[in-house]
Amino acid sequence: MSLKGKFFAFLPNPNTSSNKFFKSILEKKGATIVSSIQNCLQSSRKEVVILIEDSFVDSDMHLTQKDIFQREAGLNDVDEFLGKIEQSGIQCVKTSCITKWVQNDKFAFQKDDLIKFQPSIIVISDNADDGQSSTDKESEISTDVESERNDDSNNKDMIQASKPLKRLLQGDKGRASLVTDKTKYKNNELIIGALKRLTKKYEIEGEKFRARSYRLAKQSMENCDFNVRSGEEAHTKLRNIGPSIAKKIQVILDTGVLPGLNDSVGLEDKLKYFKNCYGIGSEIAKRWNLLNFESFCVAAKKDPEEFVSDWTILFGWSYYDDWLCKMSRNECFTHLKKVQKALRGIDPECQVELQGSYNRGYSKCGDIDLLFFKPFCNDTTELAKIMETLCIKLYKDGYIHCFLQLTPNLEKLFLKRIVERFRTAKIVGYGERKRWYSSEIIKKFFMGVKLSPRELEELKEMKNDEGTLLIEEEEEEETKLKPIDQYMSLNAKDGNYCRRLDFFCCKWDELGAGRIHYTGSKEYNRWIRILAAQKGFKLTQHGLFRNNILLESFNERRIFELLNLKYAEPEHRNIEWEKKTA
């Protein structure tokens, strides 16, 4: 297939990694890439084809999220621009059409492939994915999913296209419904369900800032102690509900629908399958989806360079199911005790403690975060060597099953396992890589670990999880490794799951600031750092500073005092922290 004499333009953002990848494909076929939006509209460019990112096109081939499209494309008026596109007769198709052209070795598209610029109406699903917590009004990003046009005639169309509101509130049998019989405020639960979906949608698509806006709005709704009756009421009475989100809330309450929410459900599922694998981020997942890869098996055959570049994906694939299973607090504590026992034999003075969601009182944890420190030791290189020695011992003892970051010493110990995974995956080309370790000295260690059968039996005999302060709402069942990908599976068949374990370290003098940082949550850390900045301070994991002068780093409570804050226990740094500090 030759594309010589063909012109293509990428919108709204030609500089994303996936678009750069597609640009290189087209250029190799002889195509010319139009870099300027204005060039698209010149009479001499009538033959240009505009390629629009799939995330801006719904299942009915309508352009959606025009406000976001306008911002990312750097346009002053998106409607005026689209009008000129239509007048000039320029054809617009989805970026994923490139995959079809390459596979068929033919440049051709049908009328059904052309993008329309009128919005479509989509019903809110009654199946809400779980999201998390909250944002400041002033930092809210416009996150409109629906069309800018919300007149009465459009609302009538939306009502006709929707399921009955009662149906939305009841939910499907076997699925988590938006509202339960115990719910006091039904409007709120309906809104929360939609915000969860929006949060998850943008998380999966790698849109961190938009996801954060919805998380924070969702948290405000969860903390709300009255039944929200309008978007305006939510905007004026609740934090983190800006005009954009208030507008959506009003549409939800009026009609039970939110245009654009479900148009990418299929895409979300495909991206989620890849993103749930350790080592795979949004960009890789999007690229593989655009190339029509539906399994790791296909990706390994057609894009082996990605696995060679980041070999940890092989272990994310191998332990896919295990690493999606959460563990009890008792199991976290059992892992801590095992590490502490081994550590005493290496350096009795060095100490280690649990951080993360365990420290915040969660009943279930996705992984284990351990913080290492040593009284009066401010040499993190010394701590790094202690952790490396500990890792070597625990690997030889059979506790560590895989490393996800290497030093030269760990590479010598573990390289055979990496090679074995490449061979099992039938990936070639790894022999050309000369070095597998990331650095001579690393101060963070990531790994997969397993308890012994005896420890697992002892764990089963424990009755209650001590220290549980927060029981999360049930999430939907996570994805499972597809049958075509099972040949790489090292997942447990006896219930003894491989667990993700992370080692961190901090200087003795920075212990207080380090504990704040590694306890989390991410939203709490962001909030307290913004608050510190507003008061003229700078807070990091290394301490509290003013004018680059360290004020406090060791005493955690003193840091709160200097910020004029009441000390927040770790369990108060979860989703309810904002309500307590408002």
From Swiss-Prot:
Binding partners and assembly: Interacts with DNL4 subunit of the DNL4-LIF1 complex.
Enzyme class: transferase
Name of protein: DNA polymerase IV
Record keywords, A-Z: DNA damage, DNA repair, DNA-directed DNA polymerase, Magnesium, Metal-binding, Nucleotidyltransferase, Nucleus, Transferase
GO function term, MF aspect, one: DNA-directed DNA polymerase activity
Chief place where the protein resides: nucleus
Biological classification of the source: Eukaryota, Fungi, Dikarya, Ascomycota, Saccharomycotina
Catalytic activity from the UniProt record: DNA(n) + a 2'-deoxyribonucleoside 5'-triphosphate = DNA(n+1) + diphosphate
